[in-house]
């Protein structure tokens, strides 16, 4: 009986380890989008927008009147997720790449310095593989917890400023263009302006128009 129990424990442990090893790193939507992006080629005349739900939520080619813009945003993505799906972009050697990321990392208690380190790794990969690609690193936007929609962001308001400080330092070190969007979206309390959102994090149409106007000179 004792041997049987020991065997059962060993089998259960092996099964648990197997499940842990094969568990997906990201959610289903990430893989649906990432595998689609694998099948959609990038060319040297394209402008890539790489990001999370804020990027995913816009029709950038229509907003900016440029059919060469390719949206590579994925809802819920973290900066390491960008790195893990970067290869198809590197292969295409796009003309420009606009990057925004880090708020989902913050929701998982990742520090600004850690976000900066992963973002720097991503930028170095782009520079090494696509030396002619112009890189634009955009700041994080504020969020607004008055809406009480995202519990994992509660108490993390100041983390955005820390992350932006780290990201700007990355942009300076790597010699890429830094676009500070934060002041355009923050109210006097440092929160996302309530008229630009309906959930405290994501943008309504007016917010995307502000974003568009801030970056259109770089897209040309």
Short names for language-model regions:
Residues 49, 69-71, 178:
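Conserved beta-strand scaffold positions in the cores of enzyme catalytic domains, especially
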Residues 40-44, 63-64, 91-92, 172-173:
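Extracellular/periplasmic catalytic domains that process cell-envelope and extracellular macromolecules
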Residues 142-220:
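Catalytic His-Asp segment of secreted/periplasmic serine-dependent ester chemistry enzymes
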